């Protein structure tokens, strides 16, 4: 009898531990089991006037719940003014280490002489993640992201979170270490998918397969490795949680790879339908947990084409976020919309609970 009781107790403990391990971060933050919680996040605020207009409209007229600001960019004062006039706006820092457009450039806030490895021959930040990877040290990256936070605070803008423009801070482990350290040190949430990452992994795998097929190298059933930056995702997520920060269960960052055929010849109604359909389909595939959905809502003017050629792609995001059909879909399917501000408040409330 005692042996049976002992075995029962051991089984109960094991079941309890397994249940804790399979809890989503959304559950640990107080949302019910099975909840699908979304941060609908607009990148690139401050990059241009058109970007700022897109952000403002997506948040005030649409379903978007959050944004992040590129502090080295020319239109930062405009978006910071909006944030201060609308204090409930959930706005973070889109930590920026690249300047990717040909005719519209910006440099580091920490000074070119302070971070020479971060600048190209024009004195601007490098145009690609690859160039940063091969030229910039982790110490230079650390100096620059801290300078960007310092500028925000000096403008009276206290960011609700940190994330990474073009994913540059995810390109090297030592960059990532500086990024995570800044968040923990300042107790500012960082964008990091530290859960099961089912959508992120599936989309990355599909992208790799598509590229291999294009190159004629794909063979049915071949092993497709997970993205390198997910190798220690769960371990890193646990570290962030232990240090008082919230963690994402998943990341939806595939919308920038969507290419509507002939988008520049389409009407707004056609663009809206195409993008809304894609958001409904992809969001519908998300598993329970806290997911950040990334987009680039923009209201392009006639001049925006001189910055980049993707104005209608970015407008597609805005048209989808303001489409009543998307709002109705989210409501009908029980999605919960949240912000980084609320997520951090819930993390503080959760305390040391596992």
Residue ranges of each PLM-predicted region?
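A short alpha/beta connector and helix-capping loop motif
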Residues: 49-73
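Structural preference for beta-strand elements that scaffold enzyme active sites
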Residues: 37-39, 64-68, 88-94, 159-163, ...
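Active-site gating loops and adjacent loop-to-helix segments of metal-dependent hydrolytic enzymes
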Residues: 106-131, 210-213
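Catalytic domains of cell-wall/extracellular-matrix polysaccharide-remodeling enzymes
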Residues: 138-253, 260-261, 271-275, 284, ...
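N-terminal pre-catalytic segment of deacetylase/amide-hydrolase enzymes
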Residues: 3, 9, 19-39
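Acidic (Asp/Glu)-rich catalytic clusters
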Residues: 28-30, 55-61, 78-90, 107-120, ...
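C-terminal domain-boundary segment and adjacent tail
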Residues: 190-192, 307-354
């Amino acid at each position: 009898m005692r042996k049976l009781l002992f075995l029962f107790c051991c089984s109960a403990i094991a079941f309890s531990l397994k249940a804790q391990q399979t809890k989503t971060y959304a559950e640990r933050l107080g949302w019910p089991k099975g909840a699908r919680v979304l941060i609908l996040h607009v990148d690139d605020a401050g990059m241009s006037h058109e970007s700022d207009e897109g952000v403002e409209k997506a948040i005030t007229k649409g379903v978007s719940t959050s944004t992040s600001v590129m502090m080295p960019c020319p239109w930062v004062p405009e978006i910071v003014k909006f944030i201060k006039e609308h204090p409930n706006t959930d706005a973070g820092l889109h930590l920026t280490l690249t300047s990717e457009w040909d005719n519209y450039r910006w440099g580091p806030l920490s000074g070119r002489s302070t971070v020479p490895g971060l600048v190209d021959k024009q004195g601007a930040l490098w145009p690609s993640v690859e160039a940063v990877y091969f030229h910039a040290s982790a110490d230079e990256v650390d100096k620059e992201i801290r300078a960007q936070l310092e500028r925000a605070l000096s403008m009276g803008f206290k960011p609700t979170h940190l994330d990474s423009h073009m994913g540059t801070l995810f390109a090297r482990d030592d960059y990532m270490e500086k990024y995570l350290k800044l968040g923990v040190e300042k107790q500012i949430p960082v964008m990091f998918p530290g859960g099961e990452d089912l959508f992120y992994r599936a989309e990355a795998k599909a992208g790799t397969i598509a590229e291999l097929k294009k190159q004629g190298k794909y063979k049915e059933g071949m092993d497709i490795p997970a993205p390198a930056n997910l190798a220690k995702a769960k371990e890193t997520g646990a570290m962030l949680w232990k240090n008082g920060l919230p963690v994402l269960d998943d990341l939806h960052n595939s919308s920038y790879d969507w290419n509507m055929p002939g988008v520049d010849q389409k009407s707004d109604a056609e663009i809206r339908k195409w993008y809304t359909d894609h958001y409904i389909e992809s969001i519908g595939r998300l598993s329970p947990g806290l997911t950040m959905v990334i987009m680039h809502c923009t209201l392009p003017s006639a001049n925006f084409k001189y910055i980049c050629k993707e104005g209608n792609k970015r407008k597609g995001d805005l048209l989808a976020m303001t489409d009543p059909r998307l709002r109705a879909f989210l409501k009908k399917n029980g999605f919960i919309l949240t912000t980084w501000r609320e997520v951090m408040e819930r993390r503080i409330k959760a305390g040391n609970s596992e």
